[in-house]
Amino acid sequence: MNFTRQRTSPIHAGEIISYKNVDLLRRFITEQGKILPRRLTGVTAKEQRQLAKAIKQARILGFLQFLYKE
């Protein structure tokens, strides 16, 4: 018998994916400012699209930086 483990989403049920929720968005960005792929984060395809859209919107509005320099 094969047992597959059901993945749990790193985004909890109460959390809203929004450009204003900067703390949530920072969890899905690398130190260089790149958006992490879903195979590393474990989010669903729908959540990944929402995250990418929210991160890009937050960058344009100035909530997040485009590049993180040392």
Swiss-Prot record:
Pfam families in UniProt: Ribosomal_S18 (PF01084)
Main location: plastid
Protein name per UniProt: Small ribosomal subunit protein bS18c
Keyword RNA-binding assigned: yes
Annotated InterPro entries: Ribosomal_bS18 (IPR001648), Ribosomal_bS18_sf (IPR036870)
Localization (cell): Plastid, Chloroplast
A cellular-component GO term for this protein: chloroplast
Lineage: Eukaryota, Viridiplantae, Chlorophyta, Mamiellophyceae, Mamiellales
